């Protein structure tokens, strides 16, 4: 599967009356665990890269990491930049 948009995942969740977990990623191990668990449970997941993660992992690396996990998963994976502090982060 490819990266899913937050809008499509939340619309589906609202329509079918379920919540979607938004999980803060601190590194590769967390992200992989969240993606694998979402696939095992057959649910979507929102991977959130917050300031702590971005302090140690450059955005281009995070982007490739999230994209790789989404492509390997049969579950929808949303990539979310959590708490962008300035336009430079966008």
Language model regions located:
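Conserved small/polar residues in nucleotide/adenosyl-binding loops
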Residues: 88-90
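Generic hydrophobic/packing signal
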Residues: 70-73, 81-85
